[in-house]
Amino acid sequence: MSDLGRGEGTGFDAERKMQFLYQLRQKGVMDKRVLTAMEHVDRGAFVRGHFASRAYEDVPLPISSGQTISQPSVVGLMTQALNVQPRDTVLEVGTGSGYQAAILSHLARRIYTIDRHRNLTREAEIIFTRMGLVNITVLTRDGSFGLPDQGPFDRILITAAAEDPPGPLLQQLKVGGVMVVPVGQSDTVQSLIKVTRLETGFDYDELMPVRFVPLVEGTARD
């Protein structure tokens, strides 16, 4: 079994949950369905080693392959902006730790999550199986091209920064669908953008400043 930090010794007990949800509300996460989903997903299961003791702090933390697990408030705000509906099919680009996909799995009918790092997708699959999350499909792919064979999607969430919303992914969004994506250079503060596909094109709404690792083409050699 992979040596994954599962949050043992920290405990996502009732008191921690109350504090965790309070800090999410303080940062603007108010959607009840999102809060309930985040209450049901123990972030400690996705944080490795000695960082597990900080799993419930509102900070990003390092994971494998030079990547990070985003701070909970950013995860909550991105999920809230995505406005996922129960019958939706969602594409997540950038599996990372798997935490975001696990939350989405409580909100949507089907989740496809892809990452260029095989070790990350493998570790995420182990955690999803352990949690009994059966509506998530995990694939090792070049995320910048999405999954055209599975689209179009009701919602697309990109958890890495692109210089512009990727064209192939925009084309995989249903009319009426929503994409949330960080846009900007990797070495500067980026903007979180909400894209809605209309009959006649796309509507863009700037939400807030963020910092994410860059969206990189190709698959990693790991």
Curated annotation (Swiss-Prot):
Reading the lineage from the top rank, the first entry is: Bacteria
Q: What is the predominant subcellular site recorded for this chain?
A: cytoplasm
Q: According to the UniProt entry, what is the EC number of this protein?
A: 2.1.1.77
Q: Which UniProt keywords apply?
A: Cytoplasm, Methyltransferase, S-adenosyl-L-methionine, Transferase
Q: Which residues form a coiled coil?
A: none
- A single GO molecular function term of this UniProt record: protein-L-isoaspartate (D-aspartate) O-methyltransferase activity
Q: Give the CDD domains listed for this entry.
A: AdoMet_MTases
* Record field: catalytic activity: [protein]-L-isoaspartate + S-adenosyl-L-methionine = [protein]-L-isoaspartate alpha-methyl ester + S-adenosyl-L-homocysteine
Q: Where is the active site?
A: S70
> By its UniProt entry, which Pfam families does this protein fall under?
PCMT (PF01135)
Q: Gene3D superfamilies, per this entry?
A: Vaccinia Virus protein VP39
Q: Is this entry keyworded Repeat?
A: no
- What GO biological process term is on the record, naming one? methylation
Instruction: Please give the GO cellular component terms listed in this UniProt entry.
Output: cytoplasm
Cell location = Cytoplasm
Q: Tell me which PANTHER family the record gives.
A: PROTEIN-L-ISOASPARTATE O-METHYLTRANSFERASE, PROTEIN-L-ISOASPARTATE(D-ASPARTATE) O-METHYLTRANSFERASE
Function per UniProt: Catalyzes the methyl esterification of L-isoaspartyl residues in peptides and proteins that result from spontaneous decomposition of normal L-aspartyl and L-asparaginyl residues. It plays a role in the repair and/or degradation of damaged proteins.
Family according to the record: Belongs to the methyltransferase superfamily. L-isoaspartyl/D-aspartyl protein methyltransferase family.
This chain belongs to the protein called: Protein-L-isoaspartate O-methyltransferase
Please name the source species. Jannaschia sp. (strain CCS1)
Supply the gene name.
pcm
